[in-house]
Design a protein with these regions (language model features):
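N-terminal glycine-/charge-rich "phosphate-binding" loop or analogous flexible N-terminal tail
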Residues: 1-45, 172-174
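Short beta->alpha connector loops at strand-helix junctions that form conserved
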Residues: 31, 72-73, 89-100, 177
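An anion/phosphate-binding loop that grips the pyrophosphate of nucleotide cofactors and donors
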Residues: 45, 63-66, 199-200
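Rossmann-like adenosine-cofactor binding region
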Residues: 55-60, 172, 179-272
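Phosphate-binding beta-alpha-beta segment of Rossmann-like dinucleotide-binding domains, i.e.
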Residues: 87, 95-149, 316
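Hydrophobic/small residue at the entry helix of a nucleotide-binding pocket
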Residues: 158
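NAD(P)-dependent dehydrogenase/reductase Rossmann-like domain
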Residues: 296, 302-318
Length: 318
């Protein structure tokens, strides 16, 4: 079997091993693949693995040997799954591999914002503590999480794990979820979307990107939030209208935002969030702990093994 990995660098920049994949067939690994290189590199392949390289209906039509597309991520909108189904091509994804890591990033942003860890460390290194008259100093508001309300937009694996961490901090947890009150643990209360935005101290986004959720965080909803509120996004960049968020931050409509994803990645130089007040941005690394990437690669190998055995797993285009 000919296997082509089109953009393997993000998952494995060199600190992990592809050996488990190589034993499954003739495996060629590219760090990155430009759109115009897809057909040449994938020619003759029965199996393609992609992270962010788009595979569309035209590609599939030009690759008659293609029978399997493995997405090296949970989200699979880079593949035209309907076209793949029409052609009998199996498409799989990697579910739940980074749940703990993403929840950890949610609270990395929350704790950095509420305790201003980065800011105060930088000020210490500038000499401000050394030259201070008191045994301590702070020059920004510091917030305790206990009894604060956190609103989770979505309560899948990552949302639920985030909820458990929040409960550990003594927070009041509310969630937008299709589950009934009776299906939720007593520590998690159900709430509708507008109510979450108007009542919660922290909003964390954990829902998929769909036509309905695109730019769900807009000027109207940001206007509902408390001026002391914090917005966290480790989900999908386009869930937020970035200009509206920048305006809300710059005008003091909300206190701060912590985002790990943007609408375009890498961001354009004129992305308004890059210069927005109290906007903390990490470069889409919530998923990228070594433990999560090891898990991703192991599941990717297992998915292809299952396909070869005639019992494919984690299919997204049944």
């Amino acid at each position: 079997m000919k296997i082509v990995i089109l953009d393997g660098f993000a998952a494995n920049p060199g600190d992990l091993s592809w050996e488990g994949m190589k034993v499954l067939g003739e495996c060629t690994i590219y760090d990155r693949t430009a759109p115009e290189e897809v057909l040449e590199r994938a020619a003759g392949a029965e199996a393609i693995l992609t992270n962010k390289v788009i595979i569309n209906a035209d590609h599939m039509a030009a690759l008659p040997e293609l029978k399997y597309i493995g997405v090296l991520a949970t989200g699979y909108n880079v593949v035209d799954t309907a076209a793949a189904k029409e052609r009998g091509i199996v498409v799989t994804n990697i579910p739940s591999y980074s749940t703990a890591s993403v929840a950890q990033m949610v609270f990395s942003h929350i704790l950095n914002i509420t305790q201003q860890v980065q800011h105060h460390s930088e000020e210490v290194h500038k000499g401000r503590w050394t030259n201070n008259k008191d045994f301590c100093f702070w020059d920004t508001p510091l917030m305790e999480l206990r009894d604060k309300k956190i609103g989770l937009v979505g309560l899948g694996n990552t949302g639920y794990t985030t909820a458990r961490v929040a409960i550990g901090f003594g927070m009041q947890v509310y969630a937008l979820t299709s589950k009934s009150h009776f299906q939720l643990p007593p520590e998690i209360k159900k709430m509708d979307l507008d109510q979450l935005f108007s009542e919660c101290d922290i909003i964390s986004l954990h829902c998929p990107l769909t036509p309905e959720t695109r730019e769900m965080v807009n000027a109207r909803r940001l206007g509902m939030m408390k001026p002391t509120a914090i917005l966290i996004n480790t989900g999908r960049g386009p869930l937020i209208n970035e200009q509206d968020l920048a305006d809300a931050l710059n005008n003091g409509k909300i206190y701060a935002a912590g985002v790990d994803v943007l609408s375009t990645e890498p961001p354009c130089a004129d992305n308004p969030l890059l210069t927005a007040k109290n906007c903390y941005i990490t470069p889409h690394i919530a998923w990228a702990t070594i433990e999560a990437r090891e898990r991703l690669m192991n599941i990717a190998i297992s998915n292809l093994q299952a396909y070869i055995a005639g019992k494919p797993e984690n299919i997204v285009n049944k």
